[in-house]
From Swiss-Prot:
Belongs to the cytochrome b5 family. MAPR subfamily. Residues 1-23 form the signal peptide. The keyword Secreted applies. This is Neuferricin homolog. Heme-binding protein. It holds the Pfam family Cyt-b5.
Length: 286
């Protein structure tokens, strides 16, 4: 008799789980199931059938065309949507930022991913507005941070048909190229972060008369005291024209200066222009 009751409970549990996946009564059902499961199911079975929730929209994402997305502009009672890297988010609760006449209204009803980096909100060109493959590695990292922000703060609504997703909502070749470039940028950043832990940053100051001054001390960078002072060098990362100042110990200067990159892939050290290789400080103007 108990076995039959146990079977009925498990059958009931499957219906409950189906309702959960449909997004119905999630909190109430979970509380009920967790409260009563132990009365009918063995401990081992409880562990086996423990509830695992997923957001209802993870596997049922809406696919929108550009024309459909443009209608979600907050006018005539419509919610406010925007797209970033082909993912659509409902930002209605941020109306003070995205409403008509507000600072981020430029992004509403479209995918203007590039503008998140460029800051150019004056003109919208649908041919280039979401062409992120033209961005620099650090910009791709910044864009990924923006996407993380929207996933955390706003409601994901679906996918935009275009560069990143096709009519079935599947990732396009373009999207895979973007992911490959993003991975390269992440690897390059990890390399630089590793080098920064080994080669601390410089002290930096600016004056109108002399421009930017960089120099090393035995506490420059992270502020922790070390046994050596070091000499300032430009530290570049892969595909990036910008650089950071790093302090390099004297014992490694000859190797780094001779090889140009010290066997760290595309991460490179360079001397400052018009500055001696053994100078304690260097000056430059941007």
């Amino acid at each position: 008799m108990f076995g039959f009751v146990k079977y009925l409970f498990k059958l009931q549990f499957l219906f409950i789980l189906a309702a959960v996946l449909a997004g119905l009564y999630r909190t109430e059902i979970k509380q009920f199931a967790n409260r009563h499961a132990a009365n009918y199911v063995d401990k081992a079975d409880v562990e086996t059938v423990s509830l695992q929730f997923k957001a209802a929209n993870e596997n049922t994402a809406t696919v929108l065309t550009s024309a459909e997305l443009s209608k979600y502009n907050g006018e005539d009672g419509q919610p406010i949507y925007l797209a970033l890297l082909g993912s659509v988010f409902d930002v209605t609760r941020g109306i003070k930022h995205y409403g008509t006449g507000c600072s981020y209204n430029f992004f509403v009803g479209r995918d203007a991913s590039v503008a998140f980096i460029s800051g150019e909100f004056e003109e919208y060109d649908p041919q280039t507005a979401d062409d992120v493959l033209t961005l620099k590695p650090n910009d791709l990292l910044g864009l990924a941070n923006w996407r993380d922000f929207y996933e955390k703060e706003y409601i994901y609504k679906g996918k935009l048909i275009g560069r990143f997703y096709d009519e079935q909502g599947e990732p396009t070749t373009y999207y895979h190229k973007y992911l490959a470039l993003l991975e390269q940028a992440q690897i390059a950043k990890a390399e630089v972060d590793e080098l920064r832990s080994k080669y601390p940053g410089c002290n930096i100051e600016w004056s109108e008369a002399k421009g930017t001054r960089v120099w090393c001390t035995n506490t420059s960078g992270d502020g922790k005291e070390r046994a050596w002072t070091g000499f300032p060098r430009k530290l570049y990362s892969r595909g990036n024209k910008n650089f950071n100042c790093a302090c390099v110990p004297e014992s490694e200067l000859d190797q780094i200066d001779a090889e140009g990159q010290a066997a760290h892939g595309d991460v490179m050290f360079k001397t400052y222009d018009n500055c001696s290789s053994r100078a304690k400080e260097c000056f430059y103007r941007v």
